[in-house]
Amino acid sequence: MKAILSSILLVAISSPAWAHTRLASSDPKAGTSIKSPSLIRLVFSETLEPAFSGATLSDAAGKTIPVSAAVGTTTITLMPLALKPGTYTVRWHSVGHDTHRVSGDLRFTVVP
């Protein structure tokens, strides 16, 4: 019995942690009102697979806003031009080393 428990413990300790990627933080934070941001930064809990991760920005009418974007090791950064006052939605998707796609969105409001 001791040998079986030891084997199980050894496998459990040596197995990699395959957690799904989740959004850990963002700037701006969801639901905030801010002046037009020069950067929108999403920080994730796990390393991203850049080829399969990204984000888009849209206005209250659902129109996609053109932005420059960069996917880093654990971040997605959007660089919009000056945003007019209104509500905006960032829709993101990420794939981590576990190969599971996770997605979500966050909204913020630009004020004059």
Residue ranges and their predicted role:
Residues S6-S7, A17:
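Cleavable N-terminal signal peptides
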Residues A19-K35:
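N-terminal edge beta-strand
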